[in-house]
């Protein structure tokens, strides 16, 4: 039986770029679109103990208050992997994150809960990528939760998460996990609306 500790694997570029597209449809102000990192972390944790956070993408600087928020909640500094501007699809950084994710299956016994903040299901037909790796961790007994924007999550990964773990659509929390710089503040996060695994 997995414990209540939560490990957050976060592909911020995927969440940000997809979220900006959602913003363009809802508010047509994508240039001002920002992620409210603290609310996103709180949504992922859902009042559970955060064991660790691994984040890749265009992330705030290590001194940013969001990382202090995570450190305060966990007692640990999150691991941040900045994507290089010239790395094309930046697959090497994704692979580094996936390696960290797979190590969880060996390093934690009993299994715990993994929250994947990404809708990237690429590579699954070759047995690689985030989708393949969450299935591997699930075989080890891990609880799996996928948080992504509905229309920007790989369809097969979303269906798998709904059937084998939990899918949390970020769209349902759009006003809380986003803000428009200089135009709209984030609303308070209401965790009572977050789906939970039964």
Regions picked out by a protein language model, each given a short descriptive name:
Residues 1-99, 138-152:
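Domain-level signal for Mg2+-assisted phosphodiester chemistry and nucleotide/NA-binding surfaces
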Residues 12, 119, 170:
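Fold-independent oxyanion-binding glycine-rich loops
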Residues 65-75, 130-134, 154-164:
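Short, aromatic/basic amphipathic alpha-helical patches
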Residues 150, 158-198:
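C-terminal helix of von Willebrand factor
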């Amino acid at each position: 039986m997995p414990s209540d500790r939560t490990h957050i694997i976060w592909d911020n570029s995927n969440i940000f770029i997809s979220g900006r597209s959602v913003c363009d449809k809802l508010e047509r102000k994508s240039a001002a679109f920002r992620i409210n990192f603290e609310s996103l972390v709180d949504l992922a944790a859902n009042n559970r103990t955060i064991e660790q956070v691994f984040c890749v993408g265009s992330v705030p600087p290590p001194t940013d208050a969001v990382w202090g928020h995570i450190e305060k909640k966990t007692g640990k500094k999150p691991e941040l992997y900045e994507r290089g501007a010239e790395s094309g699809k930046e697959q090497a950084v994704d692979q580094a994150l996936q390696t960290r994710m797979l190590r969880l299956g060996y390093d934690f016994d009993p299994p715990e809960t993994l929250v994947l903040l990404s809708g990237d299901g690429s590579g699954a037909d070759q047995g690689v990528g985030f989708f393949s790796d969450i299935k591997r961790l699930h075989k080890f007994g891990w609880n799996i939760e996928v948080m992504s924007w509905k229309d920007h999550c790989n369809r097969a990964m979303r269906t798998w998460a709904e059937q084998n773990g939990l899918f949390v659509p970020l769209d349902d929390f759009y006003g809380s996990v986003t803000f428009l710089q200089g135009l709209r503040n984030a609303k308070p996060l209401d965790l009572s609306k977050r789906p939970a695994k039964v």
